[in-house]
A protein has these predicted regions:
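Short, amphipathic alpha-helical "recognition" segments used to contact nucleic acids or chromatin
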Residues: 64-79
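Short, basic interhelical loop/turn and adjoining N-cap
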Residues: 26-27, 86-97
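Intrinsically disordered, low-complexity basic tails/linkers immediately adjacent to helix-turn-helix/homeobox/MYB/SANT
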Residues: 54-65, 113-134
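Short alpha-helical "recognition helix" segments of helix-turn-helix
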Residues: 20, 83-86
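Short, Lys/Arg-enriched anionic-surface-contact patches
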Residues: 1, 42-66
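Short Lys/Arg-enriched helix C-cap and helix-to-coil transition segments
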Residues: 46-50, 107-120
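Short, solvent-exposed alpha-helical "recognition" segments
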Residues: 40-44, 96-112
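Short amphipathic alpha-helical segments
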Residues: 7-9, 17, 25-37
Length: 134
């Protein structure tokens, strides 16, 4: 559910937002709302950053190539944050932060997990001219 909210932006920031919105073919309010959402999530969960992917904006463990949902699966599969951190060779603090994010946004993690487990044929349509090994 959304609620209207008025916001004043500096002229330069508004111009950049409008340019980005035109490039993506979305209303500036949609892009702005996404940035506010991601910004508040990042401030509350500093171990997480957002990146653009063919499937849309996705939460990653900061400074790694690991999507948060993958980190959660690794924590489960290795039997805890410390064991997963040793296996993945990343700080346990980052994985613990990703775990906290996943606990706050379980529906998002479930959707990302489902998207990440799509057949390679589906992914090949999203990322044309890319070779996936069988």
């Amino acid at each position: 559910m959304t609620r209207p909210f008025s916001l004043r932006l500096e002229t330069g920031a508004l111009g950049r937002l409008e340019r980005l919105a035109r490039r993506r073919g979305l209303p500036p309010a949609t892009i702005g709302a996404a940035y506010v959402d991601e910004g508040t999530r990042t401030d509350l969960h500093p171990s997480v950053e957002f990146r653009s992917t063919p499937a849309g904006r996705t939460a990653y463990v900061r400074g790694t190539r690991l999507q948060v949902w993958m980190a959660l699966d690794a924590i489960r599969d290795f039997g805890g944050v410390d064991k997963a951190a040793r296996a993945l060779r990343i700080p346990a603090l980052l994985l613990a932060g990703a775990q906290n994010y996943g606990q706050e946004f379980p529906e998002e993690m479930a959707a990302c997990r489902e998207e990440g487990r799509r057949p390679l044929e589906d992914i090949a349509r999203l990322v044309p001219n890319h070779c996936f090994l069988p």
